[in-house]
Amino acid sequence: MFDLKPEEARLLLNIALMAVGGNRFRSAAKILAVLELFRPNHPSVAVAKTVALMSAGDFEAAVAYVDGEALRKFPDSAMLKAFKGMALIRMERKTEALPVLREAARSTDDPAAAKMAEDLLKS
């Protein structure tokens, strides 16, 4: 069986995010789908999938993915919660976003996610 080294996984994740930045959302989705096969228990893939959906402007799909799949797999991911809150804000559903962002802002395991959530709460 083929194995993927951690540095190769990081490289593929970066390539997928570059594809997102270049509006190549289908290419990014394909890369992330393959990466998920090799790293099914790594939250960074779920975060990247969420970012890809949001970057494509599909905030509703991003929230549905986070709620229906990503947070079930990674319930303690403050970054997923912060991005969910951001997507809800973009859909003008700030009332729903506030508790999610407050929870993410309390994270001590992920200072970057906590900071992002705090900044979104101030906006």
Predicted regions and their residues:
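Short coil turns that delineate tetratricopeptide repeat
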Residues: 40, 74-75, 109
